[in-house]
C-alpha cells in the first residue's frame, strides 16, 4: 500500500518489440495497460519497473528466492513455469474461467500457462516461432522426406548433417533484438 490509501502493486517487465516502433521509449506498451487497469480499478496504483535482458533474469531469480518478487512479472514461459513448479508463485487457476479460455481460443497457449493442473502465468500475448527451409536443398541432400509433421530431434539432426555433407551451411538465426524475439533468450 502507498500513503495515498490506494493499494500499490509492482510490475516488472522486459521491454517488448512494440516499443522499438513507437519512438516513445521503454514502458510505452505497459503504460497503456496500466492506464486501462487503473481506470477500471481506481483504488489500485501500479508501479512499473522495466528490467533489461542482461541483468533481469538474475534480478528476478534473486527476488523470487528472497521472497521479494514483484506482484506482477512479464517474462518468458520457461522461467515462469519453473518458478511455479518450485512453489514460488501463486496459483492463477481462478482466472482461467470458461469465458477466458474461450476468449484465448488457443489450447496450446492455455497449456503453456500451466504446470500440470495449476496455472502460473496469465497470457497477454503470444509470438509465432517458425522454421523455413529450402526445399531444393533438402531434396538434393535426400532428406526432404524427414521434414514432416511430428518429425523428431533425430530427424532434425539427420537433416543438418546431410545438408552439411552437401556443402550447405545448415542453419541461420534471425535476431532482431531480445525484446522482439525469444530466440535469443530461450
Task: Walk through the language-model features, giving the residues of each.
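Conserved N-terminal structural module of periplasmic/extracytoplasmic solute-binding proteins
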Residues: 1-82, 101, 145
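Stable alpha-helical elements in mature extracytoplasmic
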Residues: 25-33, 56, 60, 76-79, ...
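Class I S-adenosyl-L-methionine
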Residues: 31, 35-38, 84, 93, ...
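Helix-loop-helix "hinge/cap" segment bordering the ligand-binding cleft or interdomain interface
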Residues: 39, 97, 113-180
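Short beta-strand elements of ligand-binding domains
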Residues: 73-76, 92-95, 124
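Short beta-strand-centered segments that line the small-molecule binding cleft or hinge
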Residues: 80-110
Amino acid at each position: 500500500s502507498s500513503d495515498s490509501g490506494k493499494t500499490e502493486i509492482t510490475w516488472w517487465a522486459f521491454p517488448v518489440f512494440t516499443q522499438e516502433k513507437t519512438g516513445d521509449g521503454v514502458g510505452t506498451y505497459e503504460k497503456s495497460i496500466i492506464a486501462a487497469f487503473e481506470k477500471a480499478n481506481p483504488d489500485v496504483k501500479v508501479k512499473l519497473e522495466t528490467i533489461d535482458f542482461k541483468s533481469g533474469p538474475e534480478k528476478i531469480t534473486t527476488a523470487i528466492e528472497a521472497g521479494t518478487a514483484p506482484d506482477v512479472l512479464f517474462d518468458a514461459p520457461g522461467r515462469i513455469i519453473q518458478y511455479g513448479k518450485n512453489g514460488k508463485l501463486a496459483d492463477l487457476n481462478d482466472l482461467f474461467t470458461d469465458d477466458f479460455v474461450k476468449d484465448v481460443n488457443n489450447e496450446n497457449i492455455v497449456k503453456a500457462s500451466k504446470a500440470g493442473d495449476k496455472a502460473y502465468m496469465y497470457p497477454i500475448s503470444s509470438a509465432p516461432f517458425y522454421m523455413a527451409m529450402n526445399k531444393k536443398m533438402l531434396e538434393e541432400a535426400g532428406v526432404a522426406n524427414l521434414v514432416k509433421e511430428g518429425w523428431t530431434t533425430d530427424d532434425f539432426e539427420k537433416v543438418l548433417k546431410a545438408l552439411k555433407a552437401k556443402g550447405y551451411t545448415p542453419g541461420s538465426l534471425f535476431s532482431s533484438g531480445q525484446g522482439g524475439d525469444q530466440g535469443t533468450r530461450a
